[in-house]
Amino acid sequence: MADIEEQPLPRTFEEFNEQRKAAFIRVKDYKQAGNRLIGFLCSYTPLEIIDAAGAASVALCGTSDEVIPEAEKVLPANLCPLIKSTYGFAYSQKCPFTYFSDMIIGETTCDGKKKMYELLNELKRTHILHLPQGRDRAYEREGWYEECRLLKEELEGFYGITITDDDLRAAVRRRNRLRAAQLEMFALQANQPAAMSGVDLMNTMFAGTFSFDIEAYTQQLEQKVAKLREAYDAGERPVAADAKRILITGCPVGGVINKIGRTIESNGGVVVCMDDCSGERTAAMMIDPEALDILRAIADRYLDINCSVMTPNDGRMENTLAMCEKYHVDGVVESVLQACHTFNVESARMQEAVEGAGIPYMKIETDYSNGDMGQIETRIAAFIETL
């Protein structure tokens, strides 16, 4: 493994704006202090195994259209913007987390990502987890357990360490505490009116994926929850009482927080629940740190995440309806990134389930550009007006 001091800054470093330069220096300093860094992209990545290896896990940059022209020098244009953006940031050396990571952990969720990871491996060492397409058959669950075991072995060999069960249990306890704090923050939105702007909530959760220190980020969340709860109890109401309560479901919202989330909230709505990779459906499941086979407990927890890449995927619709009830939802907006075939096809079942429960539903198919902003604002404003 190369020493970080032997690695120069990106060739285009002097062209970066000050914010990006500062981010690169922060990550470079972190690595030069002897710390380990692993990049990942998907919520199926078993982070406790990375934690137990003494490495920080950070999400790869992949939520901007800035680098998509670079990506399209290699990738086809008619591909999901998240995939193109992730590869474009690596290809152009504009993401500090990709650039300075020791390794990237990929996964075979969708066809586009798993083939992109093969190309990414030419730029940065990439270990790919083979995620099964379902979880109802015994061999699928057993196969995923084997993938988690292989990841553990990969990290042990790469870093020259041994990951013990005690290491895994300690990592589980830290992640459980983080998820408990996330769930407390989500729960504040069940208040009527909601305790905070949904855009603020989404940005808070998104920022956590770039944090090197789990415990520090957890403490920040706990403190923010306490302050929000105290302010709400004191009578502060940052959200209008008549704001229409919207649940966002579908693809990862990181690249469309402003495009969809802010548009909802500037047209008389408030995002009270995120039913995506960074939302409650991913944070809700805890792991028993006292499980006899702690690695299997970790593997089972991640395989139970509901995502459209799984078939069948009835649990996703059931969970969405449960969240609609919990958060007193007035309407559901499904965000589908262009060329995301699994969420796009599954949206028909989601619409049927949501409207069958008497809740209005709207699907928005979009990308990371601003070309359709006018159309999206018109559609969202009209949708909220009907609620």
Regions picked out by a protein language model, each given a short descriptive name:
Residues 88-156:
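Acidic/His-rich segments in extracytoplasmic proteins that coordinate ligands and/or metal ions
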Residues 32, 49-63, 70-71, 251-312, ...:
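Redox- and metal-dependent alpha/beta enzyme cores, enriched for Fe-S-associated oxidoreductases
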Residues 90, 311-328, 345-346:
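A short, acidic, amphipathic alpha-helical segment used as a generic capping/interface helix at domain edges
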Residues 2-3, 348-387:
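Peripheral docking tails and interdomain loops at the edges
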Residues 101, 324, 328-333:
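Proline-aspartate-enriched helix->loop->beta-strand connector
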Residues 2-36, 149, 153-271, 275-286:
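A charged, amphipathic alpha-helical module
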Residues 37-91, 102, 109, 116-117:
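An N-terminal, globular interaction/scaffold subdomain
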Residues 41, 247-249, 335:
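Short hydrophobic segments within beta-strands
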